[in-house]
């Protein structure tokens, strides 16, 4: 993301220099999370090697050590660390900076959230048959290439997907291991978050298979699949670690709902017309998958009958790159992209309004304002 950024809402244009905001002062927590991630991966590596010490891998033959290598490679290159940052600011919102209690738990939560996110990305790429992630080959694409290079038997794609499933499972297992040492209240909230995440992914898959294009379903997928698990649930976990009460949690949930919606709607735009140089994904990825997004639900309402027919072919039959590009252009011409941009702007305003509550620590309010801007106007 370029800094500073200029953003426009319905009635005001402001410039936000993220470098001047305290959200860039969560350094201690983020560094501790990264250190714990490294420690966790080192401990996993030690246990893996101890269990497989009797087997010496040959460089010219496929070997189960590739699962461990893929886990380490993927988890050791974290992205924006949004979820650990949200947990940090939830902790600050509940007075964590003043009493200092629960910070160790926030660090464990941050590392667990990042491992869970890695799990979700690896499995999501399998489900979406996506060969790229963060501008690099996805886990199953790497496994497929290795299968072919070393002359493995059977279907390379099926092998690669199976390896990616194992990689994701191991990442999830390590996340749960970290959470297992946390207080019961946090473990219950963690369980709720993971159930909600799986439910959202299931709605995404079923909605695509059913050709769902209604707004109600699209908003529900956005809320449960990405919005809640990116913003509200990490905020909740961090606040609980600092001993937050129900009234503050209600305020943070209000912020989380709107900020999470802004995040999910930006995902909608990036998944269709995002710059591949920033997103690491091909143009029109969500179109080709026929995903039940808010953007495509609005396109159903705005497009002509002929264009709607073309849109519905996506995910059902082969299409050319030129057809995808034409539909992306139509999303702009019809005003759908602009409409989603306005929805994002309104979501940001609503999120910022929630932070005016006197229950929220002033420092957390400033940090969360900066983060919602980062979520809403990011380029990847």
Task: Describe the role of every protein-language-model region.
Residues 1-113, 118, 122, 127-150, ...:
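Conserved N-terminal diphosphate/IPP-binding helix and adjacent helical/loop segment
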Residues 86, 175, 200, 296, ...:
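Residue-level signal for inorganic ion chemistry
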Residues 106-134, 193-198, 228, 232, ...:
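Active-site alpha-helical segments that house and flank conserved acidic catalytic motifs
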Residues 133-168, 211-228, 250, 276-302, ...:
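Divalent-cation-assisted or electrostatically stabilized phosphate/pyrophosphate-binding catalytic cores
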Residues 170-179, 230-241, 256, 348, ...:
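Histidine- and acidic-residue-rich, metal-dependent catalytic cores
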Residues 306-314:
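Gly/Pro-rich interdomain helix-loop hinge
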Residues 325-380:
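Short hairpin/turn module used for nucleic-acid contact or packing/dimerization
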């Amino acid at each position: 993301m370029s800094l500073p950024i200029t953003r426009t809402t319905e009635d005001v244009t402001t410039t936000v220099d993220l470098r001047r905001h305290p959200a860039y002062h969560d350094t201690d927590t983020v560094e501790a999370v990264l250190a714990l991630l490294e420690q966790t991966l080192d401990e996993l590596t030690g246990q893996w090697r101890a269990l497989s010490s009797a087997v010496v891998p040959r460089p010219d033959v496929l070997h189960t050590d590739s699962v461990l290598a893929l886990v380490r490679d993927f988890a050791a290159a974290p992205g924006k660390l949004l979820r650990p940052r949200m947990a940090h600011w939830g902790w600050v919102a509940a007075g964590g900076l003043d009493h200092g209690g629960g910070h160790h738990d926030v660090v464990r939560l941050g590392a667990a959230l990042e491992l869970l996110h890695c799990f979700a990305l690896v499995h999501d790429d399998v489900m979406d048959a996506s060969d790229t992630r963060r501008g690099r080959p996805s886990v199953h694409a790497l496994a497929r290439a290795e299968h072919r290079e070393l002359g493995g038997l059977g279907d390379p794609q099926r092998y690669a997907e199976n390896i990616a499933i194992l990689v994701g499972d191991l990442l999830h297992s390590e996340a749960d291991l970290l959470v297992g040492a946390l207080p019961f209240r946090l473990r219950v909230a963690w369980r709720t978050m993971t159930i909600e995440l799986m439910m959202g992914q299931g709605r995404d898959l079923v909605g695509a298979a059913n050709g769902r294009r209604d707004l109600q379903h699209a908003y529900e997928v956005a809320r449960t699949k990405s919005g809640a698990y990116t913003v509200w649930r990490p905020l909740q976990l961090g606040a609980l670690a600092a001993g937050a009460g129900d009234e503050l949690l209600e305020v943070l949930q209000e912020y989380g709902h709107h900020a999470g919606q802004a995040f999910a709607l930006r995902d909608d735009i990036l998944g269709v017309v995002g710059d591949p140089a920033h997103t690491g994904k091909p143009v029109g990825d969500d179109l080709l998958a026929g995903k039940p997004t808010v953007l495509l639900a609005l396109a159903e309402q705005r497009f002509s009958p002929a264009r709607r027919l073309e849109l519905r072919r996506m995910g059902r039959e082969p299409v050319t790159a030129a057809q995808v590009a034409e539909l992306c252009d139509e999303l702009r011409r019809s005003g759908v992209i602009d409409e989603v941009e306005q929805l994002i702007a309104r979501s940001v305003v609503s999120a910022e309004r929630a932070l005016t509550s006197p229950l929220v620590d002033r420092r957390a309010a400033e940090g969360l304002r900066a983060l919602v801007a980062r979520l809403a106007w990011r380029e990847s």
